[in-house]
Regions:
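Eukaryote-skewed repeat-based solenoidal scaffolds used as protein-protein interaction platforms
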Residues: 119-198, 211, 228, 235-242
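Low-complexity, Ser/Thr/Pro/Gly-enriched N-terminal "stalk/linker" regions
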Residues: 1-46, 56, 60, 64-75, ...
């Protein structure tokens, strides 16, 4: 099986798993279209991000069930849409910053696969995108007091929607947000700002750094921005940061985020609610062969952790009866769909930095040592 078919097979498995958990024909608008989470025993508000991978498969495989699932998700998402154009994170959680991720997913769905929709459906989806993108523009500014990943995602969302709607103010905002994010690079090349306050420095001189969010979300968003806007300065800085962060990938494709400021979401292959390192490393695979191998090793870890069409939170979760949260699956499905849409799923076998580590390396910005001894790697 070639690599592209491997990616397609896993994406199909995931989307089939999500569809099995999707409420359909319940004759209840609060339920119909939502995806039930067997672990959290609820419908996660962000499950409608799966619109994009469903649309990809509908287009690629010509199977109606994926298009129907995408349309139901769009319909269900209206339950969490607010008057100001934002989305609630969950029915029980009024955090609205996650709207930026929905904007990115819906833009990809329309950008690549709008031909699957009727003219009336497309108009309705674009009207929704227009509302949510405007909320992002009005709300997520450099002054918005949140973790840095939201500013990075805003740069991508504004670049995407600015191009889609031919809206100059969005493009200018994307430039502003990317420039803002470039201020959050440590001397070692680690992206910081995953904490409050973002600019805080600990008594030991440490900054809030989260490897998981960086490689799976922030750096991918900034790379996307740099590519769309042809901003070579940002793109080159992101590539350098990806090299630096790659030192924290283990040989099996897992990430060491033990020291991360948001390590409560650490799930070995990445972070619970972000989209996956496939985006950043996979999209640069042609330029940096080791990146393609890193992306593929992480992908193979996804396969090891997938059972019955759902991505489990770690290698041993299934064996111990720990049910999977669907957030893992629908977030990572977006990344696989985008790689397939871009045709960026090649792999060149290479050697990861973790396979030839120095015996001891110290990272002052996170007050952390990486130690390699006799085939073992430790983080202290």
């Amino acid at each position: 099986m070639n690599v592209e078919n491997e990616y397609l097979e896993l994406l199909k498995s995931w989307c089939d798993g999500l569809i099995r958990l999707q409420f359909q024909k319940e004759d209840n608008p609060r339920l119909d279209g939502g995806i039930f989470c067997p672990s959290c025993m609820m419908i996660h508000g962000r499950c409608h991000d799966a619109i994009y991978p469903m649309m990809y498969l509908a287009d690629r495989l010509k199977e109606k069930k994926y298009l129907e699932a995408a349309k139901l998700l769009f319909q269900w998402s209206g339950n969490l849409l607010c008057d100001d154009g934002s989305y609630y994170n969950d029915a029980q959680n009024d955090w609205m910053g996650i709207t930026v991720f929905s904007v990115i997913a819906l833009t990809h769905a329309l950008e690549f696969h709008a031909s699957l929709l009727t003219a009336q459906e497309k108009e309705k989806w674009e009207a929704r995108l227009n509302r949510t993108a405007e909320w992002v523009f009005q709300t997520i500014t450099p002054q918005f007091d949140v973790n840095i990943n939201y500013h990075a995602a805003c740069a991508e969302a504004m670049a995407l929607t600015g191009m889609y709607f031919h809206r100059e103010k969005y493009l200018k905002r994307s430039d502003e947000m990317a420039d803002f994010c470039m201020q959050y690079i440590s001397k070692e090349g680690l992206f910081f700002g995953e904490g409050k306050p973002r600019d805080d420095v600990s008594p030991k001189g440490c900054r809030p750094v989260d490897i998981g969010y960086n490689v799976e979300e922030s750096l991918a968003s900034l790379l996307s921005y740099g590519t769309i806007r042809k901003n070579k300065i940002v793109r080159d800085k992101v590539k350098h940061m990806l090299w630096v962060h790659l030192e924290f990938m283990n040989p099996d494709g897992g990430w060491d985020n033990t020291m991360g400021t948001r390590n409560y979401k650490w799930s070995y292959w990445g972070s619970r609610t972000s989209d996956g390192c496939q985006l950043a490393y996979g999209l640069l695979g042609d330029e940096e062969p080791v990146f393609s191998d890193a992306s593929y090793r992480n992908f193979k870890l996804y396969k090891r952790c997938t059972h019955d069409g759902l991505l489990y939170g770690g290698i041993d979760y299934y064996e111990h009866g720990e049910l999977p949260c669907v957030h893992h699956t629908f977030c990572k499905a977006k990344a696989l769909a985008l790689l397939l849409d871009f045709g960026a799923v090649s792999v060149t076998p290479s050697e990861l930095p973790s396979e030839h580590l120095d015996s001891v390396k110290y990272w002052p910005v996170i007050d952390t040592y990486r130690i390699a001894r006799g085939g073992f790697i430790a983080t202290v």
